[in-house]
Structures are given as structure tokens and as C-alpha cells.
């Protein structure tokens, strides 16, 4: 068989595989379309997550890490549950906050005042059916914890919405080898580069992937690398309408095959098939000059494969050539084998779960304006990160990155920090008096009366609202988010 014939056969097989996958996925999407969304603005593969719907309401009334009225009490409880906040401020965790029991909704938008921040230890999602909205996780180096700020691995039906994660010692947010997940409208910023990681300088954005996973409208800012890294055997991944700002020596990379003897437990697949569509890439002061400055992705050869990549519609600020054709210099595999570029490129996207997609330029405006824990209001950290992304300039730096890596102009602050102290540490989050809730069902008395409910009946929040697929409690929580 000659080389041209082999190439045609390989292309035909890839086309047939994509068509078969498309038929299966469209049937799956049609069936799931009959289910209620996690909340009205939920999109992507995690949008049908049930969370704590219809379950018990836990009120967080203290910033202590443990005991009655604590966030930890609610997280460690069993059964369907929704967590609402009657206080704002920063919770200094004494150990990892591990979500081990399924069916939970954490509604950070309910906090009265400036919102909630978790400090000191990571949040680890080790359960299915998890909804987390409007929460900050800013790890820091005080506890010498070598961890991601937020992580999920080996679980299904998870949606993270409007999370602000930063100051991690390992990756900032890592969500991979999962199934049916969405990460949307999050700010993932300022991992700690020269901190206390056992491997030395670290400070990465995250490892992302998951078989049937959606990552959209996120701001990834000021990490040296893994912006993000696609896990080996990431599965079917849809990455669109994100903003990547001020990467250091690498932007997106990874995506090779997973070794068949890999040890990850659930949802393990060998392949990576990814759409990278309509994202906005904006190099910053830390971004290495040369090819890295216009690098969309650096597909990584692993176990004989670089994955399959559909890349289109992305803007690379500063490179008209790459913006006009993302494959003209924007895709830079780490293998020099001549067949690699042809083998990884898909000319049509895999048929992912649709979202309300924007152009890359419109996504930039939306993300910098709305992403992160913006309810009850953005904190000073997110305000600064969004402003830096808009201006293309960073305000702070640590001592390590500039000494180790090439920058276009070392007179500028790199934006890559070693400690949260480099940027002033955790901002104060003030609390205000929460609205009266006589029956402690998560809905204020005045809202219940307005909707014909009884402020003395703790059970009516679990009732399905008239003309809605949601419970009354869910309707209230969504109203806080303008939905």
C-alpha cells in the first residue's frame, strides 16, 4: 500500500469515526434536553447536574471551620443538600475541604455583603452531582500546603460556575478524568511560582479534560504554564470563549494518549479529542518572546499520539497571521515528526454540547466584565486581574520568575508571583445583616410572601414552583444571579 493510499484510508476512517460519534452524541443531547438545567444559565456537559435539588438546607452562620453552622458541617453531611450563607468573610480552613458525599449545591451568591473566600487549604471534589457557584478559593502559602486550590478527578455531573481560584502552590484549578462536567465563568489566576512545591518553581493554571467536558467563558491569567494542560486521555473536550492572558513559557499543551495501564479509576479513556474555538489569547509581560508569544497550543506527543485537535476562530493578540489562520504558527506540537501535524488536525469539530457562543472579541469583553465570584460583588483581587487583562499590563511580581525565564522586557513587572504577600494578601470581605428567614429554608420571608409561600413553613422551598422545573428555593437562588 503506497503512502498516499494509506493517508486516504486513515482520513476515511477518521471521518467515519467522527460521524459515528456525532450520531451518538446528538441522540444523547436530545435525550438530555428533556431534563431541567442545574440552573438557568448552566451550559455544557455539566448543565444537567442535579446538585442538592429538593434536599435539606444548611445555613452557614459562622466563619469558623467546623461545628454547627459551619461550611464544613454542610459539606460533610449526607444526602441532597443546599448550602446558603448568612454571613460573608474569609474562612481559614484547618484542613482540606473534601466533598465526599454527592448531591450538593453551594450557593455563594447568598452571602450578605462581600461574599465568601476559603483560605489555607484546598477544595477537593470527590463526589458526583456537585454544583458550586460564586465562591472564592485563594489558597496561599501560610499552611505550606502543596496542593491545587480546586480539584476534581474521577467523578461525574459537576458544574463550577463563577468561581475565583488563585494563589495555589500546585495547579490552581484541575478538573480532569471526569465525565459530564462544566467549568464556566471562572477566574483562575496567579498561581505561586517560587513557593514551597517539592519540585521547586511551579505555579501552573491547571490540568483540564474529562470525557464530555465543557470549559467556557473563563479567564486564565498570570501562570507560568498549564494554561491549561490537557490531561493525557482527556476524552472529548470542548474549550471555547475563554480568555488566556499573560502565560509564561507555555500556553495550552498536553493532550497525548494515556497509557493503557494508567491507574486513574473512573471514566478512563485513552484518547484526547478537543475543540479549541473562539478563545482570546493575550500575551503579557511574562510571556516568552519568539514562538511562545503566538502559541495557541503545544500538543504533546505521548504514547504514540498527540490527540485530535480542532482549532479555529481564536484571536492571538499581536499576531495577525495566527489570528487569520490559527494553524499558521499557532499550533506547535512538541514532536518534529513530519506526520504529526497532519495526524492531529481535525477539519471539523467534534459535535459538542452547544453553548451560547460568542466571537472571541465579544467573549473577551464578557469574561473580563462578568467572570469570577462577581456576586455579591467582585473583590479587589478579581477587579485587579480583570483590569490587568484589559490593559495588558501587570502590577506585581515575585522574585523568582524573572530570574529564571526570558521576558520580552524585564523592566516590566511579570505578573508571576511567589506568594500572596506579593499582591497584598487576602482582602477584607465585609458582612452585612442577612434578610430575615423565619423558617430557615434558604428563602427570605419577604420573598416567600411575594411568591405566595408561608414564611413559617420550612418545607415549601422544596416544592416545584408553578410553571417551572425548579423548586422555589432554586428559583430564589437563580433570581440572585439575575436569572
PLM ranges: what are they?
Residues 92-214:
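Right-handed parallel beta-helix
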Residues 122, 149, 172, 194-195, ...:
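Structural detector of coil-to-beta-strand junctions
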Residues 233, 238-419:
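Extracellular beta-rich repeat passengers
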Residues 37-83, 460:
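Acidic Gly/Asp/Thr-rich repetitive segments characteristic of extracellular carbohydrate-active
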Residues 105, 110, 136, 164, ...:
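A structural signal for beta-strand register positions
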Residues 49-50, 69-76, 92-101, 120-124, ...:
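Short, T/G/N/S-enriched strand-turn elements that build extracellular solenoid repeat scaffolds
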Residues 420-483:
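Extracellular calcium-associated, cysteine-rich motifs in secreted modular proteins
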Residues 1-30:
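Bacterial Sec-dependent N-terminal signal peptides
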